[in-house]
From Swiss-Prot:
The protein's assembly and partners: Monomer. Binds 30S ribosomal subunits, but not 50S ribosomal subunits or 70S ribosomes.
PANTHER family named among the record's database cross-references: RIBOSOME-BINDING FACTOR A, CHLOROPLASTIC-RELATED (PTHR33515:SF1)
A GO term, aspect molecular function: ribosomal small subunit binding
Protein name listed in UniProt: Ribosome-binding factor A
Compartments reported by the entry: Cytoplasm
Gene Ontology terms describing biological process: maturation of SSU-rRNA
PROSITE patterns associated with the record: RBFA
Lineage of source species: Bacteria, Bacillati, Bacillota, Bacilli, Bacillales
The species this protein was found in: Bacillus licheniformis (strain ATCC 14580 / DSM 13 / JCM 2505 / CCUG 7422 / NBRC 12200 / NCIMB 9375 / NCTC 10341 / NRRL NRS-1264 / Gibson 46)
Gene3D superfamilies from the UniProt entry: 3.30.300.20
Length: 117
């Protein structure tokens, strides 16, 4: 990513958190956090990584709600960020948090087994 794409991604992350948290009223969208935004070098595509609190069903419902509101989110983003063209938004789950939790669980299990022996 170029320096400009990185700056645009950080600004989008901040604005998306505000838009999703305050402007969207869809009951399908649960408690979520925008963890990262990666913008392509030409500023045409933005991958938005989200973390959702809840089970797999809640995550899927949240993704459906975000897909339905994608046009509204993009227009709000266009009003807040000065770009010639607002990037196309793609929402994806941030698997790194689940991966980190899994590693932490494994370490705790290893430590518990070590103390028992």
């Amino acid at each position: 990513m170029t320096m400009r794409a990185t700056r645009v991604g950080e600004q989008m992350k901040k604005e998306l958190g505000d838009i999703i948290g305050r402007k969207l009223k869809d009951p399908r969208i649960g408690f979520l956090t925008v963890t990262d935004v990666r913008v392509s070098g030409d500023l045409q595509i933005a991958k938005v990584y989200i973390s959702v609190l809840g089970d797999e069903k809640k995550r899927e419902e949240t993704l459906k709600g975000l897909a339905k509101a994608k046009g509204f989110i993009r227009s709000e983003l266009g009003n807040r960020i000065r770009l010639r063209k607002t990037p196309e938004i793609h929402f994806e789950f941030d698997e790194s948090i689940d991966y980190g939790n899994r590693i932490e669980t494994l370490i705790h299990e290893l430590n518990a087994n070590k103390e028992e022996s």
